[in-house]
């Protein structure tokens, strides 16, 4: 059923745009598993790291990538490279590979490589880091109020490693980082963080995606549509609205109007389109038929 749905979606999108669609999923493994039990599901990040063998993480990533691609899903919004450094964190916990940047970087590298070898795009999240919060950005707007040198040592280190390991995309966090941007907007909506830090200082040239703009960190404090426009102005390529079709339409209309009026920079939007099309070309180069496995029904 899922395979048929994804195939139908691709046919529709190709007929309308001439390009393949990104079909995304949150399939981290463990606590964040979206596929049914009849599919291949792997343990979560902390459990994989507990094996002490990064090759296990690679194999889990490759299995996950192959399973997703065989079903028609081509972009996995994983792994989390957040460092689990706050015991009071309500949302990361076992989704993290560990409580040190080195551990997270070591095991995330295998997952990033495995997912891509399995035939899907992946990303590192939640930039600049969701590990040291005591609040959940699904419900409210957290703040990580620590100096830049501490952010460099703890939060940013796994992202720098993921970039060096060739991660094709990075997802931003709806979190305030006053040491990086004191203007009162979360990372997703911050040009200083997305364009200045991630693109500039860290030299990341891949795709930047937002976390879902319907999360309360954005919706409650800024409004989802305003948040979408701010994220695009900040340098985010793919702005995610994961739940409400009507809201997606409103945001698309607002973005088109902002582009027409000059509130969105046309050159920057064209550069985003180029990055998106380059990523889709990379996916198209992977022969999906070679990844199809024949497994007996459950």
Predicted regions mapped to residue ranges:
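Active-site-adjacent structural elements in enzyme catalytic domains
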Residues: 2-14, 18-21, 52-70
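Divalent metal-dependent hydrolysis catalytic cores, especially in the metallo-beta-lactamase
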Residues: 74-79, 235, 239
């Amino acid at each position: 059923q899922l395979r048929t749905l994804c195939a139908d979606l691709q046919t529709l999108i190709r007929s309308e745009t001439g390009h393949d669609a990104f079909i995304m999923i949150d399939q981290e493994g463990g606590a964040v598993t979206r596929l049914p039990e009849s599919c291949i599901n792997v343990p979560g990040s902390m459990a994989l790291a507990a094996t002490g063998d990064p090759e296990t993480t690679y194999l889990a990533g490759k299995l996950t990538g192959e399973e997703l691609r065989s079903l028609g899903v081509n972009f996995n919004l994983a792994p989390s490279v957040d460092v689990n450094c706050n015991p009071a964190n309500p949302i990361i916990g076992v989704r993290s590979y560990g409580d040190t940047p080195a551990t997270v970087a070591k095991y995330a590298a295998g997952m990033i490589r495995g997912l891509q070898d399995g035939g899907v795009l992946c990303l590192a999240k939640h930039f600049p880091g969701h590990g040291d919060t005591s609040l959940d950005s699904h419900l409210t707007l957290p703040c990580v109020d620590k100096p830049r040198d501490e952010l460099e040592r703890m939060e940013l280190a796994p992202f720098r490693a993921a970039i060096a390991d060739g991660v094709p995309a990075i997802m931003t966090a709806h979190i305030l980082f006053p040491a990086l941007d004191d203007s009162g907007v979360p990372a997703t909506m911050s040009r200083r963080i997305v364009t200045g830090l991630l693109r500039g200082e860290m030299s990341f040239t891949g795709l930047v995606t937002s976390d879902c703009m319907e999360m309360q960190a954005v919706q409650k404090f800024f409004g989802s549509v305003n948040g979408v426009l701010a994220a695009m102005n900040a340098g985010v390529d793919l702005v995610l609205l994961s739940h409400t079709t009507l809201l997606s339409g409103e945001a698309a209309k607002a973005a088109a109007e902002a582009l027409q009026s000059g509130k969105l920079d046309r050159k920057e939007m064209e550069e985003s389109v180029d990055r998106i099309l380059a990523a889709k070309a990379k996916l198209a180069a992977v022969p999906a038929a070679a990844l199809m496995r024949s497994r007996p029904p459950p």
